[in-house]
Swiss-Prot record, chains A, B:
Pfam families named in the record: HrcA, HTH_11
GO biological process: negative regulation of DNA-templated transcription
UniProt cross-references to PANTHER family, sorted A to Z: HEAT-INDUCIBLE TRANSCRIPTION REPRESSOR HRCA
Classification via InterPro entries: GAF-like_dom_sf, HrcA, HrcA_C, HTH_11, WH-like_DNA-bd_sf, WH_DNA-bd_sf, WHTH_transcript_rep_HrcA_IDD
Protein name per the record: Heat-inducible transcription repressor HrcA
Similarity field: Belongs to the HrcA family.
Annotated function: Negative regulator of class I heat shock genes (grpE-dnaK-dnaJ and groELS operons). Prevents heat-shock induction of these operons.
SUPFAM superfamilies tied to this protein: GAF domain-like (SSF55781), Winged helix' DNA-binding domain (SSF46785)
Keywords on record: Repressor, Stress response, Transcription, Transcription regulation
Signal peptide per UniProt: none
Highest taxon listed in the record's lineage: Bacteria
Length: 354, 354
DNA sequence: GTTAGCACTCCTCGGCCAAGAGTGCTAAAG
DNA sequence: CTTTAGCACTCTTGGCCGAGGAGTGCTAAC
């Protein structure tokens, strides 16, 4: 991967990629001659060499050069200026997260919005998910004669709600007592452990009422669903802005992007991969085996608290993407979100029990 | 609006519109001659009359006819067959809602998905919102030494969560006691009433601790925000499928739709209008004053429990939309959702107090 | 009132050509 | 051996033209 390239050849490659990212037009030898202080013929020779090396290509004889996947890859790994976001931008982002730090379920909206604006492409964010969710607390609230609202709080802070049928005339006091008992029974338990509590009735003293069993089973089911992330949704933002990029001149491109985002590729393939990796993942075009990604690049990072709970944040854009800026943005925002989550319950890791 | 049109002329108009909806191609006199049992010349005469009446138009001399806004309007109000969904479809939809009836926050996802598939256009759904939200219940859950999770349940069943800073070493028992006191203080109260509780400290006996005031203020703020629907989001689905329609041949169309959905037109203009109206609203093309809607039609219906809590469900598509099917779908799904919400807490309306 | 016939209009699409962009090669210069 | 000027060559792009075709509007006959 790390090819032998002399200094000037690297400069040419870098210049081609930067200009192509900037203008979306194949770059001609003439364009670089001036800034490199050599003639266009010399640049052409260098370009031809880079093309032999598989880093550049061109669309037809009389067209300028543009990078291949390998070219972009080399750029990202060896050539690119790793510019961080300006401190001003960092402050703004921090500030916005600070504003809503208490509203957990707005995080993903904010993260997607900020990332889309900062990286100037479409952003994707998944909500944080526990590897193994642990029970924290339930609450039972009477809604009317026959219905009860079950609010389930999981350890990493996510809240699930559900309604359950109840015996008529169950009072709120009774419900609170029941909730209290279940909270003790299920304290810190995993989904499996809770399912067992409902099934191995005999060990419970006094035995559980049928309503209590129903509640416990509902809790177990909700936690299992949560772990299998049946409900996991990808939130995205910035699609509209991305459509102004020239690569989206025809509607099929738009359809491709939408079907990557909403049609499963993201969820089935990219997100799991990002969850399983450390650091920022950069996937350029056809490097990924999924054919529908051929013309797109994806930059993803896990965020969260190590080994405890994690989500994914990142961007999706055309292969011709502002890699330096996008990578910095993804890295920075993943960091901010991880810090915030650390504040919320990272400490618990250090002080083992509550 | 209700023009004088003889029977045959109505038949011609209806046939033109149905065929145009079907094929997206201007319809020629020849196309209708067979099915109407007259010659193409006769059809042409009728078409010319309909054009004079402002119900049809054509793009250039040698092109077939297509409906104007007024033509579609006449069709929707006087000509269209009001076919209900098949009982099989109805059962399927009912069944799907039944499956997730307990998971309130999945309703809008399901509704949008089902509607998009049934009506075969893009669907939009807003979550149910109370006209004036009333306090139901809070719960305070210790997350770690310095942070507390506040879970707020509103009367119509929605749940808000928020984290608050707390004195170190506050125990869960203390928090539960505080929650209990606040639950009593705020019982069934409105946002304003709760804000007053926090401000008119003097009336409280014993006086509220600073943490209690913080909690109450947070509750009041959350409820106010909820009423002003600062956070109200429109969920949509089916965009990808709609892009296969021939009107989306160029990307500007896609941008237009996205900016209607996400750029404010929906939220600022259409949703409030639908919330304020009874029944199914049909807005055809330029009938609405917003220029960006010129080429689109919108069908919206309020759903919910009358005077208590309501949301909006509907579809957005090209003007050439399958009105009969879309209108039936929107009406039916709004009905199903209203029924479900009625089950949840509509009864309360009949039995005045809890 | 209906319809056959026909002239007329306007769009669509393919082919063609000129202009332009940019390369690759060659041969000369450094 | 590297660099560069020069030039022929290739391929795209955009405009233009003209044939073909679709569908109308009108007129005159039924």
């Amino acid at each position: 991967m790390h090819l032998e390239l002399n200094e000037r050849r690297r400069r040419v490659l870098k210049a081609v990629i930067q200009q192509y990212i900037d203008t979306a037009t194949p770059v001609a030898s003439q364009d670089l001659a001036r800034s490199l202080g050599v003639s266009s013929a010399t640049v052409r020779n260098e370009m031809a060499a880079l093309e032999d090396a598989g880093l550049l290509t061109h669309l037809h004889t009389s067209a300028g050069r543009l990078p291949t996947d390998a070219g972009y890859r080399f750029f990202v790994e060896n050539l690119m200026d790793r510019a961080a976001l300006s401190t001003q931008e960092q402050r703004m982002i921090q500030h916005q997260f600070y504003q809503i730090r208490s509203e957990l379920n707005q995080w993903i909206h904010l993260a997607a919005a900020v990332l889309a604006r900062t990286a100037q492409t479409a952003a994707v964010v998944t909500p944080p998910r526990a590897y193994e969710s642990r029970f924290k607390h339930i609450e039972l609230i009477s809604i009317n004669d026959a219905l009860v609202l079950l609010v389930l709080v999981l350890h990493e802070g996510s809240v699930k709600q559900q309604t359950l049928p109840a015996d008529p005339n169950t009072t709120q006091e009774q419900l609170s007592r029941i909730a209290g008992r279940i909270n003790e029974l299920c304290h810190e338990a995993s989904a499996k452990a809770i399912a067992n509590i409902a099934h191995n009735q005999s060990t419970n003293q006094p035995p559980l009422s049928s309503f209590e069993v129903l509640v416990i089973e509902s809790v177990a089911r909700a936690m299992q669903q949560f772990e299998e992330h049946v409900n996991e949704l990808i939130h995205h933002d910035g699609l509209l802005e991305m459509l102004h990029q020239p690569e989206f001149g025809q509607v099929t491109r738009v359809r491709e992007v939408l079907s990557i985002l909403e049609g499963g590729t993201m969820l089935e393939s990219l997100i799991p991969q990002a969850l399983a990796s450390d650091g920022v993942q950069v996937i350029i075009g056809g490097e990924h085996s999924r054919d529908e990604l051929r013309d797109y690049s994806v930059i993803l990072s896990r965020y969260g608290v190590n080994g405890d709970v994690a989500g994914v944040v990142g961007v999706l854009g055309p292969r011709r993407m502002a890699y330096p800026r996008s990578i910095s943005s993804v890295r920075y925002i993943a960091g901010v979100m991880s810090d915030l989550m650390g504040d919320l319950y990272g400490e618990r890791k250090i002080e083992p029990s509550e």
